[in-house]
């Protein structure tokens, strides 16, 4: 065990001896960030991919399956902005981010206790716990995004996050394969209980690694002041809300990106519960098949990351976002005409390559669109806005089945995804036009 720890420490340090300079500290932090991502996805992938099948084994209804997506989104609406304000007030953000992460991972132990509930309450207990789990989960996600944006400078992000995502997908898929096989091998519900407890233990290792990131290597950033009360009294709530809305309106680039993202996320997430229902109820997928689908998806993503990094470095974040999102209509289109899990698995290679670009560009475009001042709060505003889409989308998806069959529902979802992708093309054109006007005005001023 000590040999493994020494080997990991050697990898993190990059083989360098003595006191590291600024460049070496950055490289070390980037390596730790990648390793943290591996253990993070290992813990999460022992739980998240199998929740829908777990719910159906607990006799959950279609509406309850949809609530596995909508419930966490509803909870996060009330968590992200207060959490972001709290994080923004911290000079050092790592400790608070870790506490949010630990609180989120502790819910894995609560999930393991669901079989002890009365059978009629188990499905609702799962829905409630998954929703409540997102209270610290959404806070930790917002805090991590703000924290890591300070650790990794803009010119290093494309490569750094591509490497992180590549290793996360690779090791995450290995974990899903092993977990799926174990779940199908062990009797229900023992397998799920074992997996949820193992996920929590893995999360403890994850947090230990995250704590190794050197926050002092990041540029100094003073905490956001709490604000001085006017005449000894705090400003009324509506006045504070109005002030924040005015601040957001003064960031047109951010507002455009938020509106486009809301429409995109709505179109992206509508078919999510339909995929799970179709896989299990129509194509009769088990946990092993969920693992196989993840494996094929990862195979495509490992190829895709290198391609999309090159596109991003050449064309920028927004164009890359459009170039990648325009193809995600293929996923519901394949489901509309697929009657075999093997067909879905084969096309998952292609969709994995596509979504590696989507995930990479979404995150980098967000960091680019948010102002440096109060960055955590702006990230929370963004996440809150797209969460509204996440609340509505699964219900719309399940609702489509009340009016049409799976095939037509998937075709409608494919059309909506094309419309969602076009939103990013629109804001890219608007920004190019504004940049052109700014350049022309500058030329006129110089010639005057």
Feature names for model-found ranges:
Residues 192, 207-226, 425-438:
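Helix-loop junctions on the cytosolic side of multi-pass membrane transporters
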Residues 49-57, 85, 112-118, 172-196, ...:
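Transmembrane alpha-helix termini and helix-breaking/packing motifs in multi-pass membrane transporters
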Residues 95-111, 197, 319-334, 411-414:
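Structural signature of the two symmetry-related core transmembrane helices
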Residues 2-27, 217-259, 441-448:
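Juxtamembrane intracellular "pre-TM" segments in multi-pass secondary transporters
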Residues 2-78, 87, 94, 98-104, ...:
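Helix-loop boundary and gating motifs at the non-cytosolic
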Residues 78-95, 183-184, 303-317, 401:
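Helix-to-loop junctions at the C-terminal end of transmembrane segments
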Residues 137-152, 357-371:
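Intracellular juxtamembrane helix-capping segments at the cytosolic ends
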Residues 62-63, 154-164, 287-288, 370-382:
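Loop-to-transmembrane helix entry/capping segments in MFS-fold secondary transporters
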């Amino acid at each position: 065990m000590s040999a493994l720890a020494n080997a990991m420490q050697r990898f993190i340090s990059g083989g360098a001896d003595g006191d590291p300079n600024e460049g070496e500290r950055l490289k070390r932090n980037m390596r730790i960030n990648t390793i943290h991502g591996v253990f993070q996805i290992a813990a999460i992938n022992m739980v998240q991919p199998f929740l829908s099948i777990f719910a159906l084994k607990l006799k959950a209804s279609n509406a309850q399956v949809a609530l596995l997506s909508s419930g966490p989104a509803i909870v996060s609406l009330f968590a992200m902005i207060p959490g972001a304000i709290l994080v923004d007030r911290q000079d050092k953000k790592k400790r608070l981010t870790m506490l949010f992460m630990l609180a989120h991972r502790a819910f894995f132990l609560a999930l393991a206790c669901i079989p002890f509930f009365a059978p009629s309450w188990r499905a609702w207990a799962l829905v409630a716990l998954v929703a409540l789990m997102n209270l610290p989960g959404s806070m930790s996600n917002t805090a991590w995004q703000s924290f890591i944006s300070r650790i990794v400078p803009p010119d290093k992000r494309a490569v750094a996050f591509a490497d992180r995502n590549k290793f996360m997908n690779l090791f995450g898929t290995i974990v899903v394969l092993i977990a799926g096989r174990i779940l199908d091998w062990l009797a229900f519900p023992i397998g799920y209980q074992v997996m949820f407890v193992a996920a929590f233990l893995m999360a403890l290792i994850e947090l230990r690694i995250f704590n190794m990131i050197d926050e002092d290597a990041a540029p100094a950033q003073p905490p956001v002041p709490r604000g001085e009360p006017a005449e000894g009294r705090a400003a009324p709530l509506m006045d504070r809300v109005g002030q924040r809305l005015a601040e957001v309106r003064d960031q047109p680039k951010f507002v455009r990106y938020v509106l486009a993202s809301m429409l995109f996320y709505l179109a992206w997430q509508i078919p999510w519960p339909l995929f799970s229902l179709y896989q299990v109820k129509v194509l009769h997928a088990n946990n092993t098949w969920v693992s196989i689908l993840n494996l094929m998806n990862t195979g495509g993503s490992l190829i895709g990351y290198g391609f999309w990094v090159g596109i991003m470095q050449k064309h920028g974040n927004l164009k890359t976002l459009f170039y990648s999102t325009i193809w995600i209509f293929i996923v519901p289109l394949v489901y509309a005409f697929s009657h075999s899990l093997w067909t879905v698995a084969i096309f998952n290679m292609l969709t994995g390559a596509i979504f590696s670009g989507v995930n990479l560009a979404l995150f980098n475009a967000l960091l680019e669109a948010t102002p440096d001042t109060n960055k955590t709060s702006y990230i929370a505003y963004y996440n809150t806005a797209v969460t509204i889409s996440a609340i509505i989308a699964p219900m719309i998806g399940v609702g489509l089945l009340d009016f049409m069959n799976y095939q037509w529902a998937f075709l409608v979802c494919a059309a909506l995804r094309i419309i969602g992708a076009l939103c990013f093309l629109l804001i890219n054109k608007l920004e190019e036009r504004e940049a052109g006007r700014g350049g022309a005005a500058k030329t006129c001023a110089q010639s005057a």
